Every structure is written in structure tokens, then in C-alpha cells.
Amino acid sequence: MKLAITFWGTQKYIEFLPEWYERLEKYFVPNVEKQYFVFTDGDLEGSPDNITKMEIPHYGFPTTYHKTFEEMLKLQDKVSDFDWLVTVDADLYVQQNVEYGEFFDESKKYFGVQHPCQYLDFPPHNEYPGSFDVNPASNA
């Protein structure tokens, strides 16, 4: 079993990487091989061997979100031998053990999770339209 995990952190968001990495190594599907693909404009000198830097510019908000899948296509050849590709937000820290069967479902090719800010009704998620697209002309 091998997991490819992406981290997105340009400018100050790269500061989340050390604790993010430590917690994923410790708590997220322990004892499973993980390779981290870090999309950043920052310096990763001295990083562990299981971190691969994916150089990107700081696009700024909201362009960063719009460029995510375009940038992820650069991983296609690098992750073809992995069992799963997972993206974990830079500011989302794993708090306790997450076992394989609790997170992955072999019967499904794709999956998504609800961001904690939505689940906890943090602004703007607690008011219409929240974070969901409500534009009737949208194909999202």
C-alpha cells in the first residue's frame, strides 16, 4: 500500500508544513508508505526523503483554487504507481489515528470529505449561500 499526499502552501502557508507533515506521518494510516508532493514557492531544503517539491508560483486568491487541478496534472506520471492520491489542506492537522478502513473505500474510485469549517458552521458557511455555488448558470 502506497499513498501519495499533496500539500499546497505558497508564501506564509508553507509554515504549516512541519506540523502538518509530522501529524500525517504519526496519525494518518500509520505504517503505510507515504510520499508527499508539496506544491510551493518556498524553500524545502533539508526536507525528508519522502517529500517531493512541486514548484509553483503564488497565484493569489482565488486563482490558486482555480489552478489546483491544472497543477495536479503535473503529478500524473509521478503518482501512477500509488494506490491513492489524497489532498489534505495545509491548515488541517490530523488529531488522532485514522486507520485505512476508516478513510478509504476500495469500492469507490473517488471520494471527498467535508471541510471542518463547513461542518462546524464557521462563517461564511453558517449563512446563505455558505461556500456552495448557488448560481443557476453554473455547471459546478
Regions found by a protein language model. Name each.
Residues 1-64, 77-81:
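N-terminal anchoring/stem segment of glycosyltransferases
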Residues 22, 53, 69-70, 104, ...:
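General N-terminal targeting signals
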Residues 51-57, 121-135:
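Cell wall/extracellular polymer interaction/catalysis modules
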Residues 63-73:
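Glycine-rich, basic loop-to-helix element that forms the pyrophosphate-binding segment
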Residues 71-121:
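GT-A fold catalytic core of metal-dependent nucleotide-sugar glycosyltransferases
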Residues 136-140:
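Catalytic core and acceptor-binding pocket of nucleotide-sugar-dependent glycosyltransferases
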